[in-house]
Amino acid sequence: MSNTLTPLSIQRVKDGFAKQGWEYDDAGEFAIRSGFVGIGLEISHIEPNVNVVSTVAVDSIGADRYEDVRAWVEQYNYTKAYPTVTALKDVDRGITALGAAYTLPGHWGYTDAQFESHILTGIQGVVAASRDFLAEFAPEVTQRLNEVPQEG
């Protein structure tokens, strides 16, 4: 592992995934998609930052729940340092969804250890926020996710 400060890139993310033995799918030149404990996410390099994002939408959380979800995300953002969560209302589909994002600023370099730690923190934060949202608004989905055997 290098102690040299290195700029951010999607290749560094891929290298970290390979080191951990994690699977991912390429999602274009600057992004990958993966999932952890039933939560899908995308990691992208949008110069100069690396972003870990997820959108969680289930049919059981209707558009009529938007105000409830918005109040929940306001409280979540107030009490958590990361990730940032947003209530999303899709009137056409009749659902309210959650957006969760963690951004690793890229205006300076990171050692390999720092980079891996930040990416892991981002993944853990986005997954935890997504599962907290589901536990609050769609506990039946959380229960089903918990019943699915996890690869390991």
Positions of the model-derived regions?
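Charge-rich, low-complexity N-terminal segments
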Residues: 1-46
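Generic recognition of long tandem-repeat/solenoid scaffolds
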Residues: 29-35, 52-53, 98-100
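A short acidic-to-branched-hydrophobic micro-motif
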Residues: 41-60
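Short, internal acidic amphipathic alpha-helical interface segments
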Residues: 56-101
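Glycine-rich and polybasic anion-binding loops at the starts of cofactor/ligand-binding domains
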Residues: 100, 128-133
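A short acidic/glycine-rich loop-to-helix N-cap element
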Residues: 106-121
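Long, contiguous binding/interaction regions
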Residues: 124
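Short, highly charged C-terminal tails/helix-capping segments
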Residues: 134-152
